[in-house]
């Protein structure tokens, strides 16, 4: 079989631990035998981020901007324990947060559904897609650990140096902590447009929730800008497509999502989306069964698996044990990036390969070959075996070869 040509590269962002191992296995077993893979490689492993003082992360973000498409492996965001383990000079920032801030995009996360795995929320018949604003809020916050009594103030000075606002946050009588968050109208507007455009492309309603009754400036701004974009730019198209936009308080939206049939785009502020995407993944099946794509306003796409580095499997694998790690989300990340490259370049063969890659993985799982994470969710009668990584990828490759020759 002649390899599929890929003249234009994508940015490849490698990562850490077990997902790094699986990353290489997927490339070598499922992609390189069939595609003349063309990537610009960036090593975002924690040791290399330490070596480059995290410059490699900024370089990777610029590559995604330039090439329009990137695919990213899961990476470690270090805490104090990881700093000691890896001998880090400092606690480097989350690569995801850095890249999201650089691209100023929206993260869309949707579960990969299997007929054999029933969702915890039994009324869900279709996927719930989380649209997470990927800028600002907690992830760009400024914090201060208050040592003792004193006053914390929120001050705004305009570009000419004139003080426009000074508000007391709190008069501390003892130690405490203070935090200041921000966002930009331009980023919120692009977030809204990304959500409505994506929803139109997949034919789903948009639900958005915030807490404007309490946050009468911050959350109210989100609410008003969403409504403005919808009314002025998308309402006619939504009505023509038979779709709807719904706003409610975040707690009300959360309750309504759990009672819905699914098939909605749930727009969330940054922190809300971080939490709710994992909740939706767990309720749908398993976190390794969650796709993720970051879409920027200027048409850049970054695909990744919406899970961590699977540290426990890595430690076991390093001891020589055979492990059973779910590869589907990582496979879907590669497939998504290759498909988008093919769509942008008019490369029909690459688009077809991407669909076959996804289908091959689904077919093997639907045949009852489950990974460790899924066996814990099902009755033993629901699956036939629990193959290790090498065996599972071999089964998927055989199925992929069949699909490509049909």
What are these regions (language model features)?
Residues 134-135, 140-149, 153-192, 199, ...:
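Glycine-rich phosphate/pyrophosphate-binding loop and the adjoining helix
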Residues 2-8, 18, 22, 28-53, ...:
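N-terminal alpha-helical transmembrane segments of multi-pass membrane transport
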Residues 46-60, 223-264:
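N-terminal small/polar loop signature for handling phosphorylated ligands or for N-terminal nucleophile
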Residues 36-41, 202-210, 234-246, 342-354, ...:
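Flexible, glycine/charged-enriched surface loops at secondary-structure junctions
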Residues 6-25, 154-248:
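Glycine-rich phosphate/diphosphate-binding loop of Rossmann-like nucleotide-binding domains
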Residues 257-359, 363-367:
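Glycine-rich phosphate/nucleotide-binding loop
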Residues 47-164, 271-275:
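N-terminal glycine-rich phosphate/adenylate-binding segment common to multiple enzyme folds
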